[in-house]
A protein has these predicted regions:
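Gly/Trp-centered helix-boundary motif
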Residues: 1-210
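Cytoplasmic-entry segments and transmembrane alpha-helices of multi-pass inner-membrane transporters
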Residues: 208-209, 220-248
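Hydrophobic alpha-helical transmembrane bundles that constitute the permease/transmembrane domains
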Residues: 215-219
């Protein structure tokens, strides 16, 4: 029951099979865990890059996005995140320096779509859109057409680059979560718990209880009937009438 275990799941998501019968295709929750990794360096600058590909083919915007990563570095490298959209436009999402350290450390962090730095960075690129984006969420800007605030379908490439001068640094591992409205075969609850897992955990206990109750019912009925037949006369009649009342 540790909420930390469910943070990568969406809140109150519907089952993914609903998209098979729905006229409007809702965005599925995506957890991208296998990025393309590139490393490069020249005489001064070292680069560690992770890229995530996403095929977005839905009729609504995603709920949010979360980028989780761990990096190894010293001093204060620069982390930049951008996305190349299906229309060829490249949007800069965030550019920030990681916390300074004299020694080589492993730093873990998450970047949420609600981060004020992301919203500010996207607002500086408002001239790419034909409508006002000031009041829109980050995900609604990134996944929007430039002519109207409607989902732009196609392939997206999210790139995360870690730059450091002279010293070597790298992104050890990372994943990108695109928050959707459909997840798994049973969906999730308001605490992000996968309902299918709860069903699997509860099934053995439910089967055990059902089996015990059914066997106990048969044994009780057998004993009841044998005793009524053995005693006969008024005892049998009384027990049968009592049985009729219970069944009624």
């Amino acid at each position: 029951n540790n909420p930390e275990n469910w943070i990568t799941y969406p809140k109150t998501a519907i089952p993914i099979w609903v998209n098979l019968i729905s006229m409007e295709k809702l965005p599925e929750h995506k957890i991208l865990e296998n990025p393309s990794i590139e490393k490069a360096s020249n005489n001064e600058i070292n680069l560690s890059s992770h890229q995530f590909g996403l095929n977005f083919d839905y009729d609504q915007f995603p709920n949010d996005f979360i980028y989780s990563y761990s990096s190894e570095y010293s001093e204060s490298p620069l982390l930049q995140m951008s996305v190349i959209r299906p229309d060829g436009i490249k949007l800069e999402i965030i550019s920030t320096s990681l916390p300074y350290s004299n020694l080589k450390i492993i730093h873990e962090d998450r970047i949420f779509s609600t981060d004020a730095m992301i919203k500010k960075k996207l607002s500086l690129q408002s001239d790419l859109f034909d409508f006002e984006i000031k009041k829109l969420s980050s995900e609604n800007i990134i996944f929007s057409k430039t002519t109207s605030n409607e989902p732009l379908k196609g392939n997206y490439i999210f790139s995360v680059n870690l730059y450091e001068i002279e010293n070597s640094s790298e992104i050890i591992e990372s994943n990108l979560i695109i928050g959707g409205k459909a997840f798994g075969i049973m969906g999730t609850d308001e605490l992000r718990r996968d309902l299918a897992i709860g069903l699997l955990w509860g099934t053995p206990l439910a089967l055990f209880i059902g089996l015990v109750v059914s066997i106990a019912s048969v044994i009780m009925g057998l004993v009841y009937g044998v005793y009524a037949g053995f005693k006969g006369k008024k005892t049998d009649e009384t027990l049968m009438r009592f049985n009729d009342v219970i069944y009624a």
